[in-house]
Design a protein with these regions (language model features):
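Hard-cation-handling environments
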Residues: 279-409, 413-595, 603
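A glycine- and charged-residue-rich anion-binding loop/surface
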Residues: 94, 118-129, 143, 440, ...
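Intrinsically disordered, low-complexity RNA-associated tracts
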Residues: 1-80
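Short glycine-rich phosphate-binding loop at a beta-alpha junction
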Residues: 170, 463-464, 625-626
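Conserved hydrophobic residues forming the short capping helix/wall of the S-adenosyl-L-methionine
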Residues: 185, 479, 614
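Conserved beta-strand scaffold positions in the cores of enzyme catalytic domains, especially
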Residues: 88, 196-198, 269-271, 406, ...
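C-terminal tails and terminal domains of large nucleic-acid-associated
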Residues: 595-603, 607-631
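His/Asp/Glu-rich metal-coordinating catalytic cores
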Residues: 56-146, 153-366, 385-399, 418-421
Length: 631
């Protein structure tokens, strides 16, 4: 996976935008002041007491139709009477953005929801990506029945190629998500060793003691799903990443009816997306961005238009293509991740491209500016993304012109503001018109949508997921407003073991979790010590001392020679280097006088003496590496 691909998906994973469209409009909340939340009464494993049950009606009326016969047969099996509590164990994704993975365990069955990666912090120098530590799954591999994936963003699928090497079980998800996973596995030469199982919205699969139903939701990528996880201890609903979009660009709106139907069954717990829990109101529909594109294309009819957006936002790409077609423009796509996702989505029918609309990037120069639209990666200022290379004049095929109109169809992710600002400045200096406001909506639910899902599902317990601690606590506050008791709301940390049934729920312990750092082909071979060394080198540089000693007497035969990298420029610091050599010689003479012959101790004496000297002279502490050779 390229750095461009990494940064692209990292930004999607951490999306939490402000602005006109993402903020939405708050609707009045008319619940009576004396309203008290009352979860529906259920017996110990989530079924209505016999005297309360209605006579069964047709399946289409009481629940979603299951498209496969096998699923219908299996999903109708009699629920197992609960003898144990359900364990929910988040192995990542809480108190952070990215690396989403949660284990659901009941007796001898474990089902894992999502398996995502995170991306390195600024101080993780040289690190390619970060994956969750799945030691718990490896220790209980005989129990693991499969991975169930909610959608195809990197923070939910990105760790699969690494984790499946140790925990090789089937992976279940919807059509587009499975296709994106297959692309990743192909890059790792794992297509023949991994079982990928495609499911449909409404289908129920059975994995050990669990039955799992996929529910249609809306998000910034197609085929996103919520999950209804049925266990003998009760039903848990996991929303995945979602928003409520009544007018989606492609496909159906979120299946709120099914959420309500499951809510009437009695839901033990709801695990709900917290990314936008700090924001009031509703998230605006993706379709609203299309009207903005229409206005911009009409305003800049004679200009070449370049639009930067997230690679996986297929609906956004569809609207750009639709607008370009209406205005008689050809569309070119640039950026590896953008090309991969668009190609896959088009092949599967999730992207509809009119004939003779799409052209190769090499053909852009053959058309007048007013007949071209370029869709590119780089909306977050990623240094190696296509737009950044254009801004820096190092792109091989596209040169920015003074009459270009460049649209950022995204908002800067927290932490990316400087990088985005740098690219905008570089583009503006070339005379381009840069538009970066009001051309984006979020893919995550705001407070009123969160309230809606809770009102439909009516869970006994609330478990905010997907977000930093402030996002989780923001959802906790929203849920308290709905009347769910504080003691029934669990803000968990990665590694917590939450045991629950219809009678009680409590955190009973922890499992080992953490981050595994991936550096090139190395997985887990870079730890805190290596990172500390890299940080030290980056901040203060290194000074290498080379000296040759006589084998028996430890008398200096050659040197000391001093090599500096990243500390000082030797030619301009000759006095400092001469002083450093003198300090090393004195330290070696001191060892000889004190009859210190152990090379390890000699290196320590040299290092301490040189470090003290350099600090006094420069107030800096480079890494010092003594090398002793014998002759």
């Amino acid at each position: 996976m390229s750095n461009e691909n990494n940064n692209q998906f990292n930004n999607e994973a951490r999306e939490n935008h402000d602005g006109q469209f993402g903020h939405g409009q708050k609707r009045p909340y008319n619940r009576p002041k004396n309203y008290k939340y009352k979860p529906q009464h259920r017996n110990s494993y989530g079924r209505k007491p016999m005297q309360d049950r209605k006579a069964p009606a047709d399946k289409e009326k009481n629940g979603i139709q299951v498209p496969f016969k096998a699923a219908i047969k299996n999903s109708s099996r009699r629920p197992k009477k609960p003898t144990s509590k359900l364990k929910i164990i988040p192995l990542g994704g809480l108190e952070q953005i990215g690396m989403n993975i949660t284990a659901f365990e009941y007796e001898d069955s474990i089902v894992v929801v999502d398996c995502g990666l995170a991306f390195p912090e600024d101080d993780m120098l040289g690190i390619y990506l970060v994956i969750p530590d799945v030691t718990y799954l490896k220790e209980n591999i005989s129990k693991v029945k499969g991975f169930v994936i909610t959608h195809g963003h990197e923070d939910h699928i990105g760790a699969l190629p690494y984790v499946l090497k140790d925990v090789n079980v089937p992976v279940y998800s919807t059509k587009l998500t499975i296709a994106l996973i297959a692309n990743k596995l192909k890059e790792h030469n794992m297509t023949n060793t991994t079982k990928l199982k495609e499911v449909r919205h409404g289908q129920v699969i059975n994995l050990g003691d669990f039955s799992i139903e996929f529910i249609k939701t809306n998000h910034s990528i197609q085929d996103a799903s919520a999950l209804a996880i049925y266990s003998p201890a009760g039903i848990v609903v996991h929303t995945g990443d979602f928003k409520v979009d009544y007018t989606p660009v492609f496909g159906d709106a979120i299946d709120l009816q099914r959420f309500a139907e499951i809510g009437r069954k009695g839901v033990l717990a709801l695990m709900c997306d917290s990314t936008n829990a700090e924001r009031t109101g509703f998230t605006m529909s993706e379709r609203s961005v299309g009207h903005v594109f229409d206005n911009l294309f009409n305003e800049y009819k004679t200009n070449r238009i370049i639009i930067a957006t997230f690679a996986s936002n297929v609906d956004r790409v569809q609207q750009i293509i639709n607008t370009a077609y209406r205005f008689g423009r050809k569309v070119a796509v640039e950026g590896r991740s953008m090309v991969n996702v668009i190609t896959t989505a088009a092949e599967l029918g999730y992207l509809r491209i009119p004939d003779q609309t799409l052209i190769e990037i090499d053909q852009v120069k053959n058309y007048p500016d007013e007949q071209v639209v370029l869709i590119t990666t780089g909306s977050q200022g990623e240094s190696m993304a296509a737009l950044s290379r254009m801004a820096a004049n190092i792109h091989k095929k596209i040169v920015i012109k003074p009459n270009d109109t460049i649209i950022f169809s995204s908002n800067p992710i927290p932490g990316n503001e400087k990088a985005v600002s740098k690219v905008i400045n570089e583009l503006s200096m070339k005379g381009a018109k840069v538009i970066f406001q009001d051309v984006h909506v979020s893919g995550h639910a705001c407070q009123e949508e969160i309230k809606l899902i809770y009102s439909l599902v009516k869970p006994k317990y609330a478990i905010p997921v997907h977000g930093e601690y402030r996002h989780l606590t923001a959802q906790k506050n929203v849920v308290e407003e709905l009347g769910i008791p504080k003691e029934n709301i669990f803000v968990l940390a990665s590694g917590n073991i939450l045991e629950l049934d219809s009678q009680s729920a409590q955190v009973t312990g922890t499992v080992h979790t953490g981050a595994i750092l991936v550096d090139g082909l190395g997985v887990g071979d870079v730890g805190n010590i290596v990172l500390r060394d890299r940080q030290h080198l980056a901040e203060d540089g290194i000074m290498i001392v080379v000296v040759t000693l006589e084998r028996h007497s430890n008398v200096i035969l050659a040197g000391p020679d001093i090599v500096s990298r990243g500390f000082v420029y030797v030619r301009e610091s000759e006095d400092l280097m001469d002083g450093a050599r003198e300090v090393v010689e004195n330290a070696l003479d001191s060892c000889l006088e004190r009859n210190i012959t152990d090379w390890g101790k000699i290196k320590t004496v040299v290092k301490d003496a040189l470090s003290e000297f350099l600090w006094k002279r420069t107030k800096r502490s480079p890494m010092i590496l003594p090398i002793i050779m014998e002759a």
